[in-house]
């Protein structure tokens, strides 16, 4: 088993980056995106990131930048997989990409304060030379939760605009493709006031 904390080559590589530089953050974000796309597994790269951070080799800021890249990389994979699917599948994949890219953009605008705030929630000092592996897991979990909750809290108010944007970018290949996935019987708000009719309309859709 390789002890990364005593691997001088690995230590020197990560030490060559300035963890306080946005150039470093963007570099690791891009690296996380590319590696996730190549590995086809954000979970595997997340495990590697946790090992690097918990061993003290990779600073938490750079580790979270990798995680942000993983969030984008995994959506690129789903978009490629959906290329041969129907219009609705491609739109769903693109909406996922749009959601994550938007979240990454606003996090980058206040990257260091945001990470410091998340670390303070779980009582971790991000400037410490070594972060306990158990505490690091809590930091990464807290970051993922805070990131997704905040991103959802913002974008939930812009679902109609997001839908229009996604439909504008991903156009149906033909009219029939659009009609095949449109609800014909369920629509409006009045039907929801009568559960019996709702069941009947749902049966018609099926």
Q: Where do the model's predicted regions map?
A:
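Helix-loop-helix hairpins and the membrane-proximal interhelical loops
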Residues: 1-34, 52
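Membrane-spanning helices that line or support transport/gating and their immediate boundary helices
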Residues: 3, 48, 75, 79, ...
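Membrane-interface helix termini and inter-helical loops of multi-pass transporters
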Residues: 3-17, 116-131
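Membrane-interfacial helix-loop connectors
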Residues: 20, 36-73, 82-88, 94, ...
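Alpha-helical transmembrane segments in multi-pass membrane proteins
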Residues: 23-24, 28, 32, 36, ...
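Structural signal for the N-terminal portions of transmembrane helices
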Residues: 89-102, 126-161, 168-169
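Flexible glycine/proline-rich, aromatic-decorated loop/lid segments
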Residues: 112, 119-132, 172-182
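Non-transmembrane accessory domains of multi-pass membrane transporters/channels
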Residues: 149, 156-206
């Amino acid at each position: 088993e390789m002890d990364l904390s005593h691997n001088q080559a690995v230590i020197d590589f990560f030490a060559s980056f300035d963890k306080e530089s946005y150039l470093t953050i963007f570099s690791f974000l891009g690296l996380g995106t590319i590696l996730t796309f190549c590995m086809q597994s954000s979970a595997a790269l997340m495990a590697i990131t946790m090992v690097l951070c918990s061993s003290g080799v990779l600073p938490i800021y750079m580790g979270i930048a990798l995680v942000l890249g993983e969030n984008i990389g995994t959506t690129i994979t789903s978009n490629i997989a959906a290329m041969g699917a129907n219009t609705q599948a491609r739109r769903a994949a693109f909406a996922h990409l749009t959601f994550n890219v938007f979240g990454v953009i606003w996090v980058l605008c206040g990257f260091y304060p945001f990470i410091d705030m998340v670390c303070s929630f779980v009582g971790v000092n991000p400037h410490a030379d070594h972060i306990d592996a158990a505490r690091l897991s809590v930091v990464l979990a807290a970051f993922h939760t805070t990131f997704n909750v905040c991103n959802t809290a913002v974008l939930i108010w812009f679902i109609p605009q997001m839908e229009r944007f996604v439909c504008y970018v991903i156009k149906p290949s033909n009219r029939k493709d659009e009609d095949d996935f449109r609800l014909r019987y369920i629509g409006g708000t009045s039907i929801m006031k009568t559960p019996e009719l709702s069941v009947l309309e749902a049966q018609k859709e099926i």
